[in-house]
Every structure is written in C-alpha cells, then in structure tokens.
C-alpha cells in the first residue's frame, strides 16, 4: 500500500501526503520511483517467507492491476466524455483491487480451504475500496488542503475527472458546462471556493454521496 502511494505521488507530482512533504518533494521523482520499487520488492520478499504460491499469485496480479488503473486514468486525462463506468473501473483498479488483494491474502493464510469465506471477504473488501475512493474524491471538494493533508482539486488541475465533477458536468446547462470544461486541466488560477460552490450547486457532491452509499 505504501509503495502505491509513493508512486502515485510521483505520477500526480503531489507535494504533500497526510500533511507532510512527499518523497518527490523532499528529493526528486527518481527517488520516489526507486523507493516505491524498493518497498514493492520488500513486500514480495516478505510474502515469499509464507511459502504460499496462491498468495504470491494474488499479490503479483494485484500489483499489475494497480499499475493498469494508473494507466487507464492517465488515458482519460483531458477527456470530457468520461463515463461513470470509466470512473468505477479506475476506482477498482487503483484502490478496490488493493483492498481486495489485502483481504484475500489474509483470508487465504487464515482459512485456505474455506473458499466461500475467502470469496466473501474479497468481495466485501473490493467494494469497500471502491467506496473509499469515492469518499476520497468527495472530500477533495469538501475539505481544505490542511484538513485533507494534501493539495485540494489537484485532479481537476491535472485534467482528471472525478465523481463530483462528473455528476456536476452531467447536470450542467450549456453555460455551466462551458465554465466547468474551461477549468478542467487549466493552469489558470481559479478560486477553489468558487469551483466547489459550483460543483455543489450542480449536485456533484450530493450525487457522489448517493453513489457512495450504494457501495
């Protein structure tokens, strides 16, 4: 999990995480990539100690899927025709898959022969992970940088559509849609409060909360 966050900070060029400077801010992106790789390899070394190929298989597949999620999200940057299916897919691969694999590996280790137990815990954790990502996207439009522990609206400035923006865009009239698309990926300085107010006004937060509750 830590490795994915370190790499995610490099991809997003995030200066802070949990209220402190990121590795790439303190040093360079190269440091972030190498330290992330080091942590990944350490995780696999620890898993090898369990001598369980099923756990190793799950961990390696999850690592591959998480990278896939980052690539899918990068491919959606700047696109204004992103669907809810696209967003759920990214949430699953980037976050849900990590939750799912973590729970599944623990379940395999604890009750290897109980397939129903393993599957139920895996599915629960998958949906919990997707819900976590939806909540994280919602908080980006609800809290300030200090409360969030990282810069707010960073996805928006990078041209990444998240749930609140998606729903607001879907509900917008021609004038509001023009404004929303003008700030997507824009390097111009806009007041965060103005953007958040517009997203709220268009039902972006409310509909995201409704989606969150469905998970």
Residue ranges: model-predicted function:
Residues 1-215:
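All-alpha prenyltransferase/terpene-synthase fold signal
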């Amino acid at each position: 999990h830590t490795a994915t966050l370190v790499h995610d900070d490099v991809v997003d060029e995030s200066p802070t995480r949990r209220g402190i400077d990121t590795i790439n801010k303190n040093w360079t992106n190269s440091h972030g990539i190498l330290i992330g790789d080091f942590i990944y390899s350490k995780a696999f070394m620890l898993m090898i100690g369990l001598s369980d190929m099923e756990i190793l298989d799950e961990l390696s597949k999850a690592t591959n899927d998480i990278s896939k999620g980052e690539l899918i999200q990068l491919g959606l940057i700047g696109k204004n025709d992103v669907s809810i299916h696209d967003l759920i897919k990214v949430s699953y691969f980037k976050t849900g898959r990590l939750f799912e694999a973590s729970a599944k590996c623990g379940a395999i280790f604890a009750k290897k022969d109980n397939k129903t137990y393993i599957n139920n815990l895996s599915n629960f954790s998958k949906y919990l992970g997707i819900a976590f990502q939806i909540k994280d996207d919602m908080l980006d439009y609800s809290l300030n940088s200090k409360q969030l522990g990282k810069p707010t609206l960073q996805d928006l400035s990078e041209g990444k559509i998240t749930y609140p923006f998606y729903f607001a865009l879907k509900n917008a009239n021609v004038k509001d849609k023009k404004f929303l698309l003008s700030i997507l990926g824009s390097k111009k300085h806009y007041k965060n409060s103005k953007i958040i107010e517009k997203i709220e006004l268009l039902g972006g937060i409310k509909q995201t909360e409704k989606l969150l509750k469905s998970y």
